[in-house]
Amino acid sequence: MSSQYSNVENLSPQTIRQVMKELQDMESTPPEGIKVLINESDVTDIQALIDGPAGTPYAVGIFRVKLTLSKDFPQTPPKAYFLTKIFHPNVASNGEICVNTLKKDWKPDLGIKHILLTIKCLLIVPNPESALNEEAGKMLLERYDDYSQRARMMTEIHAQPAKCGAGASDAKDDDGPSTKKHAGVDKKLQDKKKEKLLKEKKRMLKRL
């Protein structure tokens, strides 16, 4: 695995303040189906949980994504990765995401929220014409039912709520990013899920 490093010392104080403000705004008023995970010690390491959109093969899943800001941000776009393993035409084997917003359509005034919403939209409308996963792109165009079944199966295996942290490491490849800094957040989320399930079980037992 390649070494991971931070560009936080290379960003201007103004950019750091701007990014942190946007992250805090999203934390207090999250976009629908998106939960941002703030790493206050390194604003260049941005992670979020995205709910699989209804009506798609990803609907039952929660997907962890990572944005890595370059030292020239916002003049140059960040790199985006799925940390949760996913079968999608526009996601490479190491999780890297291919979307025009982060390539030719990038503008410095586009914020983190816009990027995360674009990634969520990519789950609804994949673009097989610019596929990083050629198998998924070809399958989507020629055998959609098979594509949908494969994507749904991968979602059920890797993108379940209890795996939103543990499953992240499954998507790491040689060039994939690390998730260690957010391990504490993962544990809190999983503990809440377990507590909720326990309460539901107790309620069901009382009804018997």
UniProtKB/Swiss-Prot annotation:
Record-linked PANTHER family: UBIQUITIN-CONJUGATING ENZYME E2
Signal peptide residues on this chain, from the entry's feature table: none
BP-aspect Gene Ontology terms: anaphase-promoting complex-dependent catabolic process; cell division; exit from mitosis; protein ubiquitination
Reactions that this protein is recorded to catalyse: S-ubiquitinyl-[E1 ubiquitin-activating enzyme]-L-cysteine + [E2 ubiquitin-conjugating enzyme]-L-cysteine = [E1 ubiquitin-activating enzyme]-L-cysteine + S-ubiquitinyl-[E2 ubiquitin-conjugating enzyme]-L-cysteine
Function text: Catalyzes the covalent attachment of ubiquitin to other proteins. Acts as an essential factor of the anaphase promoting complex/cyclosome (APC/C), a cell cycle-regulated ubiquitin ligase that controls progression through mitosis. Acts by specifically elongating polyubiquitin chains initiated by the E2 enzyme vih/UbcH10 on APC/C substrates, enhancing the degradation of APC/C substrates by the proteasome and promoting mitotic exit.
Protein name as catalogued: Ubiquitin-conjugating enzyme E2 S
SUPFAM superfamilies for this protein: UBC-like
Residue ranges of domain UBC core in the record: 14-160
InterPro entries: Ub_conjugating_enzyme, UBQ-conjugat_E2_core, UBQ-conjugating_AS, UBQ-conjugating_enzyme/RWD
Keyword Cell division part of the UniProt annotation: yes
Record pathway: Protein modification; protein ubiquitination
